[in-house]
Design a protein with these regions (language model features):
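Phosphodiester-processing cores and adjacent nucleic acid-binding clamps
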Residues: 5-196
Length: 196
């Protein structure tokens, strides 16, 4: 889609009374989402440049269980803010939320977690502040400490109990979003389970 077409869409839907309605993209991926599965071709600098060019107020970088691009994104956002001082970068993470399960060690010594493939729910967490980013880092560290391979795909489960342990003692620093069709809410809705 050409820039002119995207600009027209934004002008049609997000500009009211001559002023831009604040719009933030809260779920984006970069080349850092490819640490365990090739997911995205967006480069961080290009992604941020494009968002600023389109007039977005900001965006959230929410790579798949990966915080490695945050420093690069912060540095480039500072450059963008020279021209667009109101542009905001929100640091986040798309985690794979799962029920707590005990690890299982196979005969060859490999550790895995008996989680069914469909029971990894995509869940986006956005840091509101430095404490929120610390919580993201702790949750990510826990998930990576459980990394295992299932049918050729790396799995990085974040357990519900991790959220309890990390977030509940000091709440209010993260914003949670349901993510995509891989999220629990979407899966329940698509299955017709309106009760949950």
């Amino acid at each position: 889609m050409k820039t002119a077409n995207l600009r027209r869409i934004f002008e049609t839907y997000y500009i009211k009374g001559g002023a831009m309605t604040p719009f933030y993209e809260l779920h984006t991926h970069s080349e850092y989402s490819n640490t365990h599965l090739i997911d995205c071709i967006n480069k961080i600098n290009s992604l941020l440049d494009r968002a600023a060019h389109l007039g977005l107020c900001g965006l959230a970088l929410t790579d798949h269980e990966c915080l490695s691009g945050h420093i690069k994104a912060l540095n480039h956002a500072k450059e963008i803010q020279q021209e667009h001082p109101d542009f905001q970068l929100i640091l986040g993470n798309e985690i794979y939320l799962s029920q707590d399960v005990s690890p299982v060690t196979s005969e060859n010594g490999r550790v895995s977690y008996p989680i069914e493939s469909g029971q990894f729910f995509h869940f986006v967490l956005l840091a509101k502040d430095a404490q929120g980013h610390r919580q993201l880092r702790e949750l990510s560290s826990r998930a990576w400490s459980r990394c295992y391979s299932y049918k050729g795909v790396e799995r990085l489960p974040t357990f519900y109990s991790d959220l309890d342990d990390v977030v509940l003692p000091d709440p209010g620093h993260l914003i949670a979003c349901t993510a995509c069709l891989g999220g629990e809410f979407a899966k329940l809705t698509l299955a017709g389970d309106v009760q949950g």
